[in-house]
Regions:
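C-terminal or mid-to-C-terminal helical accessory/interaction module adjacent to the motor/catalytic core
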Residues: 139-218
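Generic structural signal of hydrophobic/aromatic residues within well-ordered alpha-helices
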Residues: 87, 139, 165, 177, ...
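A short, hydrophobic C-terminal helix/tail in secreted or cell-surface proteins
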Residues: 257-261
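Long, highly charged, low-complexity internal segments
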Residues: 45-77, 89, 185-256
């Protein structure tokens, strides 16, 4: 029987395969020593477009908003159909007894694998290869200590929530603002706040005016201090005069070994 490992990228799959002794190159995967090592190319499965839910959603109309799917649909990512077909065939091979999620150790890696596994209709047991190093020793150790895939169900659900939230915000908000302003305006959960940061920063640069300010410096035998920026020259001079007429007092002494820092 064989174990199928699915990695997130071809380069990672090759590194994992060579570390585990699967060096024979096939079409879309590597094999050897009882292992089949294949790969995704990022997301092979994506959230289906709104038009796939109902014909009326193929046109952008204000009256059809919001679009809130009750049952979610998925579709192959354009241009990646061949590798998806290879993975589906491997997942259903009779000699494959176990599937290993070898995608990147993180939320998105979990989603990339689960989408393929579930859309392929695979029911074989699957485990998780969770590694952050591409050293041969780390790969072999991670493979030997792989854990049941179900232990990462919460991570998968988190990734699924993120993907669906992106879809809901992106599809509905993009259509809404595009219809209202009569031109395509892309809106997204990450895109829009990021764009806002750039707009705010650009506005600050545009509205920036040079201002004079004053800082009062105090030197006390090697223990120096300084005030915040003071825009009023008279206030800064008053602070300087007050400090010159005063005596500095040590309120706290703290010592430490250099090794502790």
């Amino acid at each position: 029987m064989s174990v199928l490992i699915i990695c997130e990228k071809p380069s990672v799959a090759k590194t994992v395969a060579l570390a585990l002794g699967a060096a024979e190159q096939k079409d879309g995967y590597l094999s050897g020593d009882g292992l089949l090592v294949s790969w995704c190319i990022g997301h092979l499965i994506s959230m289906a477009d709104a038009g796939s839910y109902d014909e009326r959603y193929k046109k952008w109309r204000y009256e059809e908003l919001p679009i809130l799917p009750q049952t979610w649909k998925y579709a192959p990512t354009p241009g990646k159909e061949k590798q998806l077909a290879i993975l589906k065939e491997l997942l259903h091979r009779s000699d494959v007894s176990e599937v290993v999620n070898g995608c990147d150790a993180g939320r998105e890696g979990e989603l990339i694998f689960r989408f393929v596994y579930e859309q392929a209709g695979c029911t074989k047991p699957f485990s998780r290869l969770w590694i952050s190093s591409m050293e041969d020793s780390a790969i072999r150790e991670g493979f030997a200590g792989r854990r049941a895939g179900t232990e990462y169900d919460a991570l998968y659900q988190s990734a699924l929530c993120r993907a669906r939230a992106d879809w809901l915000v992106g599809i509905n908000a993009t259509r809404l603002f595009s219809v209202l302003y009569h031109k395509t305006l892309n809106v997204g959960r990450v895109l829009s706040p990021t764009l806002n940061l750039l707009v705010e920063r650009d506005g600050k640069i545009t509205m920036f005016h040079k201002e004079k300010y004053h800082i009062v410096h105090i030197g006390c035998g090697g223990v120096d201090a300084e005030s915040e920026r003071i825009s009023d020259a008279a206030a800064a001079d008053t602070l300087r005069t007050t400090c010159e007429a005063s005596q500095a007092v040590c309120c706290l002494l703290y010592t430490s070994d250099a090794a502790d820092e």
